[in-house]
Amino acid sequence: MKDVGFGITVQDKNAPDLVPLYKISNEMGMEFATASLHNSFYFVEAKNIIHDRSMVAKNFENLVNELLRSNSPKKWFRAYFNHGLINYIYGQKRLLPCDMSFDTFFIDPYGDVMPCNGTKDKEVMGNLNTQSWDELWNSPQAEVVRKKV
């Protein structure tokens, strides 16, 4: 199999598992992806909160240090991304801007095209049942959504 890896959405309960899980994935030669706990209209959740931010941030910092010890530029980039998640946990901007809606997108089962399914509110760029792809992608509504992401 190719392109198999581990992914973890980090919260208070699993933050201490970050480095051990990374080490397991590394030993198995697999990718390791992270995300911070967040709220999303798609998953009908608005109460996701990281309560112990300093503990979660410390575990992200430990992961960043592990990634920087490697000889892989890809892992160094992931360290930078994870360092940015520390900012995000504290309510600051991420270091890397979100590029969703510019080169990637999410289509729901009803044809609504959105930047992703992880936004707090449903941000629809258009609908493939009523618009052509070019019309939707280049529409004023798509530009409005891109400015929000």
Predicted features and spans:
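Residues that scaffold the ATP/ADP-binding catalytic core of kinase and kinase-like folds
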Residues: 116, 136
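Cysteine/selenocysteine-centered motifs that mediate thiol-based redox chemistry or coordinate metal-sulfur cofactors
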Residues: 138-149
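Short, local alpha-helical segments
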Residues: 118-121, 143-145
